[in-house]
Amino acid sequence: MQGPLLLPGLCFLLSLFGAVTQKTKTSCAKCPPNASCVNNTHCTCNHGYTSGSGQKLFTFPLETCNDINECTPPYSVYCGFNAVCYNVEGSFYCQCVPGYRLHSGNEQFSNSNENTCQDTTSSKTTEGRKELQKIVDKFESLLTNQTLWRTEGRQEISSTATTILRDVESKVLETALKDPEQKVLKIQNDSVAIETQAITDNCSEERKTFNLNVQMNSMDIRCSDIIQGDTQGPSAIAFISYSSLGNIINATFFEEMDKKDQVYLNSQVVSAAIGPKRNVSLSKSVTLTFQHVKMTPSTKKVFCVYWKSTGQGSQWSRDGCFLIHVNKSHTMCNCSHLSSFAVLMALTSQEEDPVLTVITYVGLSVSLLCLLLAALTFLLCKAIRNTSTSLHLQLSLCLFLAHLLFLVGIDRTEPKVLCSIIAGALHYLYLAAFTWMLLEGVHLFLTARNLTVVNYSSINRLMKWIMFPVGYGVPAVTVAISAASWPHLYGTADRCWLHLDQGFMWSFLGPVCAIFSANLVLFILVFWILKRKLSSLNSEVSTIQNTRMLAFKATAQLFILGCTWCLGLLQVGPAAQVMAYLFTIINSLQGFFIFLVYCLLSQQVQKQYQKWFREIVKSKSESETYTLSSKMGPDSKPSEGDVFPGQVKRKY
């Protein structure tokens, strides 16, 4: 009973908020905390704060003003060398790292222009900086040696780049561990920038996470992953950025390079390494934030990649890295390992086939109509109500809701929260539809197997007991686990569907492949059982017409049970375009086959349709008779030539 009350209640709340908003248009005496009144009509958040809705001027009474963290992307205030940014409520400040202080003696400053941080430690620190300076100068000469890179082949270039990356990491970590008392070291030139941080004791509550910044790129890593449980000696983390290396190991080294896409590298190449233990597993993924080399729209394809070394050379790979957030200036990635990283972007993505789009929308529209008619038939036709029609009804409802949401919501990528909800709902509805297809296959097999013993009652009891918990419960558990584990992978930049990152698509494809494989096996078993049964009957029973009808219904069951979805996995190679058309045409008409087989070709349903048709005609005839009688009046008598509906004029 709560469902009918929900919509009026929601409308009431919206109207209440609208009335409150209208009243506040003439006065903003009650702006939220950290906000000020503008022209006595609107509120605006104070400097250092932003509204929850993103609007500069607002009147909504429940709006909030949240603190802006200027030290993180997309703001990322740059404090200069040997300094870090600290966020405070409504503001921020820069401060020299330990071992450095301002020339003026002040504790804080506002930006890199005010940075006069000077070294105050012993000569060992100077030696450490000198060592780092030698490293960056040495490798700068290698990176800028155009003759070296032009004379080498593709495989030699990747191998040389891999060697350089490993050597820089090793030498930088070695330098940082020589003098761990110098907590932070920063150095850079035109080609390489380095920051190292050393840990000499256990992780504290204040330093659970370390943040390193070089050339507007940053990395967040857990302290426990740096020390790896080793409390006997110092540990260090190094973060290195290469300004020009991306021109050498560019997007042509991407292992998933598609000739149809113009992919380019849109960030500096960065490396991350920890020591003294090198090849270690991380308890939690590191977060990397890249500043774009070119400001680009956030709707482009974005790939978080790392430099993967193999026996045949090295290349950019997405394994273990996935996208968290992207805007015009920055990209944020999560990676489950340490290596060298970058951001690749697709300048132009593959255009959609307009013919396939038309086929999809027309086919799904026809399916929606057929599924609606089928669902109404199963609901209203009392003569055919049983376990079988209950299965048909649930399958029809799930497919109807899934197709309807697909048509109206698949492209609604903004706001992102709504897009994620749509993606999650589509995930659940299509999984539920496939689960009901599996139950259809199981019921069909059990019915065929028990033809000889006529044990329908036990089948019905079994299906009634398991079908609803399985049909709706199993998909709910699958989606709940997926959403709890990877909520950010619901919704992409151009579709409200599942991300391809981290193999997340297999949370849908895995169950689907298992279901249509099981249904294909069940279909073959049913076909074999029916063939044996029919061959044992009197030859007169199996007429040519009945055989043809049986063959047609059996073929249609392939579509209804979802076995044709395997065509979606065959869209590779030269036949990809043909398979795409077959997959789209066949599966967009699944609803039509359900209505055709379970309704139009069912004798019981045909009789019910005929009964309904006669009742409609009779009702219409009686209505016309009543209307005509009303026009003639109670005292009127029909003339000899008048013939009422349903009467035949007799000749004597």
Swiss-Prot record:
Highest taxon of the lineage: Eukaryota
GO molecular function: calcium ion binding; G protein-coupled receptor activity
Topological region Cytoplasmic: 379-389, 438-464, 530-557, 602-652
Domain EGF-like, residue spans: 24-66, 67-118
Main location: membrane
Note: Has no murine ortholog.
Subunit architecture: Forms a heterodimer, consisting of a large extracellular region (alpha subunit) non-covalently linked to a seven-transmembrane moiety (beta subunit).
Name of the protein in question: Adhesion G protein-coupled receptor E3
Organism of origin: Homo sapiens
Organism placement in taxonomy: Eukaryota, Metazoa, Chordata, Craniata, Vertebrata
Gene encoding the protein: ADGRE3
